[in-house]
């Protein structure tokens, strides 16, 4: 830690830039924002790391992101701004700052608790939340209510990423990290069935399914740095890759899974069911899709209303 200048959370290797007192810096960063979404580079947008931590005050933070958005959208109106954020993003999603977020609170975390009973770092197990369909829907409703519909529909829905344990490892329902458990333990006791359930939900829940490289090939790993293992060239799980291809195809063929409204249809101990619905007035015409997930070991019969 560092006590001679302001670092992000005190880390000397991550100095915080002084936007408040440096107009030149401020404009320089806005120029970078415009450059990479413009020709000839044509980036599709920006992923903004811990975006709420920028600046020294909330007022400065919000003003910077308003100006950043204006610069980006002027250069490329179709460019997207996705913020990494923990907690409610409500104050940033009013149409003048971020477009959406990496969807930890309204996708990754509730899904992980429901399907595995594990927190997204594999640091904590809560058996009471494993398979609790009612708790899953309650968490989703609460966190989705903090975002406008447009932001929900394009939120970055991940099962894993570089900062958290691989979802495949969470299916072993074991608390651990690289230093305490070792790399091999991340690959032991995993469940391909539970993993496939996660993929099904990722491809049918509102938002933008975002596959962290290697998830589709069966890569395991505890939280950072173990979750950043190299892609297993030549050793991919081809059946899992094909399953991702199959579920992506279902999402592509059913417009309701991409753009439709959401309705919880059933929930209880060990199961959920939800529907996605689209009216005839939308592109692709009227359609609907129903997803049912059973976390138990026995067959289950549901009456879908």
Question: What are these model-predicted stretches?
Answer:
Residues 305:
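Solvent-exposed beta-hairpin/edge-strand motifs
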Residues 256-287:
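Surface beta-strand/loop "capping" patches
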Residues 10-26, 49-60, 121-134, 167, ...:
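The substrate-binding groove and active-site-proximal loops of carbohydrate-active enzymes
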Residues 30-57, 159:
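Active-site groove signature of glycoside hydrolases
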Residues 1-41, 68-74, 91, 112:
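Substrate-binding/active-site clefts of carbohydrate-active enzymes
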Residues 142, 231-267:
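Aromatic- and carboxylate-lined catalytic core of secreted/periplasmic carbohydrate-active enzymes
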Residues 33, 65, 69-70, 78-224, ...:
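Conserved alpha/beta catalytic core and glycan-binding cleft of carbohydrate-active enzymes
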Residues 61-65, 240:
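Amphipathic alpha-helical segments in well-structured domains
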């Amino acid at each position: 830690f560092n006590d001679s200048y302001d670092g992000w959370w005190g880390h000397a290797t991550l100095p915080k830039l002084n936007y408040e007192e440096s107009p030149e810096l401020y404009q320089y960063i806005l120029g970078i924002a415009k450059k990479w979404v413009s020709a000839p580079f044509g980036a599709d947008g920006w992923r903004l790391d811990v975006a709420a931590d920028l600046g020294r005050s909330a007022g400065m933070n919000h003003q910077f992101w308003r100006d950043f958005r204006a610069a980006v959208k002027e250069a490329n109106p179709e460019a997207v701004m996705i913020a990494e954020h923990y907690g409610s993003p409500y104050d940033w999603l009013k149409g003048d700052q971020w477009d959406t977020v990496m969807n930890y609170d309204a996708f990754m975390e509730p899904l992980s608790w429901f399907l595995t009973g594990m927190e997204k770092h594999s640091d904590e197990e809560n058996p009471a939340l494993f398979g609790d369909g009612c708790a899953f829907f309650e968490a989703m409703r609460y966190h989705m209510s903090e975002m406008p519909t447009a932001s929900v529909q394009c939120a970055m829905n991940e099962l894993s990423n570089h900062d958290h344990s691989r979802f495949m490892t969470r299916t072993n329902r074991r608390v651990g990290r690289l230093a305490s458990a070792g790399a091999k333990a991340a690959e032991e006791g995993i469940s391909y069935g539970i993993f496939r359930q996660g993929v099904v939900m990722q491809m049918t829940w509102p938002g933008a399914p975002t596959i962290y490289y290697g998830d589709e090939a069966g890569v395991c790993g505890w939280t950072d740095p173990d979750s950043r293992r190299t892609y297993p060239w030549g050793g991919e799980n081809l059946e899992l890759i094909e399953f991702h291809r199959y579920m992506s195809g279902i999402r592509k063929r059913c417009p309701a899974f991409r753009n439709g409204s959401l309705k919880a249809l059933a929930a209880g101990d060990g199961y959920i069911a939800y529907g996605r619905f689209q009216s005839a007035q939308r592109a692709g015409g009227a359609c609907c899709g129903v997803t049912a997930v059973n976390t138990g070991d026995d067959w289950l019969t549901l009456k879908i209303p």
